Amino acid sequence: MKKHTHHKAYGDSTGKEPLIDLQSIKLWLNSFGNQGHSSEAVLNVLFTLGVILFVIYQVASLLHRMNKRVEKQLESRTKQRKVEVADKHVGDEMVFTDLHENVIRERMIPYRMPVINDDITLRNSQIFYEEMKMRRSCRQFSSRDVPLKVIQNLLKTAGTSPSVGNLQPWTFCVVSSDSIKTMIRKILEADERDNYVSRKKGASWVVDVSQLQDTWRRPYITDAPYLLIVCHEIFRDVHSKTERVFHYNQISTSIAVGILLAAIQNVGLSTVVTSPLNAGPDISRILRRPENESILLLLPLGYASEDVLVPDLKRKPVEHITKLY
């Protein structure tokens, strides 16, 4: 007795249900013949089935090609990303580029500087130098108020400074509160006094008391209408997990301070660059600054008093600070 074998299409020997059972199709076609249908109708049905199978095959092939194309595009983008990162000397750690989104996705715009002839350029450079050579560290301030809008413009100018990866890691704290300035002054003076005493040990300290008071006191911290406290980031959270230290943020912020000093001189105000020494953490707590910030410098800001005295500085000539190659 013959065993009936079922021919399966798109099936395999794993026991999976086939997509198309040829035996069922054969029985269905026989039913057409038994019902008196013409052979032409059977051929039409077969043709229709063939067309359907062909369409299914074409769709499957198209989807397969599309998947391949997407995979190639993703691979190409990954390679291009690595090339861009390498060209910008970012390094191998992709976590670094997550902090610098503009490294990959920066948008370039036209840049045009006004065309100035050499005579005007020379004149402007000389005028700017004559203005900047008048700059002095001022420790005596008048009570004349400074409009807050002027302070904002000065800080906007400082914010134009370049920074590594355009992180702009600086924060400028503007203190006008007398009580806060008084607290900061006490902390600075206590720290400076301890620092000075540690250098002046022994009997000579008694002799230097009068000079000591002039040395460690910081009256300009409270005398100036404003006290600018310059902070910079020392780390940043990456994916809310990893903390990365940025040593170059101090360099970027220092450049911004240089631009700020020039802007201060340009508007006729005065300041003196003051280091926080070891008082930075205490000042940060007073200002409630986040833990990822460190205080770089303090800048009391205002108009110089009429009776102010400044050192008679002799700056090095340009030939002593320049090397031509």
From Swiss-Prot:
Disruption phenotype: No visible phenotype. Fully suppresses the rubber band uncoordinated phenotype in gain of function (gf) mutants of sup-10 but only slightly in gf mutants of sup-9 and unc-93.
InterPro entries assigned to the protein according to its UniProt record, in alphabetical order: Nitroreductase (IPR029479), Nitroreductase-like (IPR000415), Nitroreductase/BluB (IPR050627)
Effect of residue 258 to S: In n1471; loss of function
Listed transmembrane segments: 42-62
Outcome, altering residue 322 to P: In n528; loss of function
One cellular component (GO) term of this entry: plasma membrane
Residues that hold FMN according to the record: 135-139, 163-164, 273-275, 315
Gene3D superfamilies: NADH Oxidase (3.40.109.10)
Bilayer disposition of the protein: Single-pass membrane protein
Record Pfam families: Nitroreductase
Subcellular location: Membrane
BP GO annotations: potassium ion transport; tyrosine metabolic process
Presence of the UniProt keyword Plastid in the record: no
Swiss-Prot/TrEMBL keywords: Flavoprotein, FMN, Ion transport, Membrane, Oxidoreductase, Potassium, Potassium transport, Transmembrane, Transmembrane helix, Transport
Tissues in which the UniProt entry reports expression: Expressed in body-wall, anal depressor and vulval muscles.
GO molecular function terms listed in the Swiss-Prot or TrEMBL record: iodotyrosine deiodinase activity; oxidoreductase activity
Positions on the Cytoplasmic side per record topology: 63-325
Effect ascribed to mutating residue 288 to K: In n1022; loss of function
Cofactors (names): FMN
EC nos: 1.21.1.-
SUPFAM superfamilies reported in the protein's UniProt record: FMN-dependent nitroreductase-like
Domain of life: Eukaryota
Role this protein plays: May contribute to coordination of muscle contraction as regulatory subunit of the nonessential sup-9 potassium channel complex. May act downstream of sup-10.
Family: Belongs to the nitroreductase family.
Name by which UniProt lists this protein: Iodotyrosine dehalogenase 1 homolog
